[in-house]
Curated annotation (Swiss-Prot):
Keyword Phosphoprotein listed: yes
General function of this protein: Major role in the synthesis of nucleoside triphosphates other than ATP. The ATP gamma phosphate is transferred to the NDP beta phosphate via a ping-pong mechanism, using a phosphorylated active-site intermediate.
Underlying gene: ndk
Molecular function in Gene Ontology: ATP binding; metal ion binding; nucleoside diphosphate kinase activity
Protein name: Nucleoside diphosphate kinase
Primary enzyme class: transferase
Gene Ontology biological process terms in this record: CTP biosynthetic process; GTP biosynthetic process; UTP biosynthetic process
Reaction catalyzed: a 2'-deoxyribonucleoside 5'-diphosphate + ATP = a 2'-deoxyribonucleoside 5'-triphosphate + ADP; a ribonucleoside 5'-diphosphate + ATP = a ribonucleoside 5'-triphosphate + ADP
PROSITE patterns (UniProt xref): NDPK, NDPK_LIKE
Entry binding sites for ATP: K10, F58, R86, T92, R103, N113
Keywords, alphabetical: ATP-binding, Cytoplasm, Kinase, Magnesium, Metal-binding, Nucleotide metabolism, Nucleotide-binding, Phosphoprotein, Transferase
Active site residues of this protein: H116
Assembly behavior: Homotetramer.
């Protein structure tokens, strides 16, 4: 079944000019990019996006990191998009990520791990709606 998932190219990757390399990986792995834009998160946006982590020790540093540079948010589409995207990006910790995954190849650390990906269809839908209106998403 064709699904949509949500992606963020995070500040560490944007600062190192890896946007093109990462978007190319998406397309090489069968994903259609049906929406994409560069944004600079406000504190309110970053805190809202990561609200489920509020009160945790890593919340404040995560918010600061996500505000440190523009990010690229995208909506990707393909069969089994959520699962396949999670496989493509690899585990959160790049040291344990499989060879050939985006995080193994590009991430600097567990926090500066280059990309975010939705972990369920429900979260993908919520995250897509957080950043995109329906008129910004295009069928291809």
């Amino acid at each position: 079944m064709t699904e949509r998932t949500f992606s963020i190219i995070k500040p560490d990757a944007v600062k190192r000019n890896l946007i093109g390399a990462i978007l190319t990986r998406f397309e090489q792995n069968g994903f259609k990019i049906i929406a994409s834009k560069m944004v600079r998160l406000t504190r309110e946006q970053a805190e809202g996006f990561y609200a489920e982590h509020q009160g945790k020790e890593f919340f404040a540093p995560l918010v600061e990191y996500m505000m440190s540079s523009p990010i690229v948010v995208s909506v990707l589409e393909k069969e089994n998009a959520v699962k396949d995207y999670r496989t493509l990006i690899g585990t959160t910790n790049p040291e344990t990520a499989e060879e050939g995954t985006i995080r193994k190849d590009f991430a600097l650390s567990q926090r500066e791990n280059s990309v975010h990906g939705s972990d369920s269809i429900e979260n993908a839908n919520r995250e897509i709606a957080y950043f995109f209106t329906d008129c910004e998403i295009f069928e291809r």
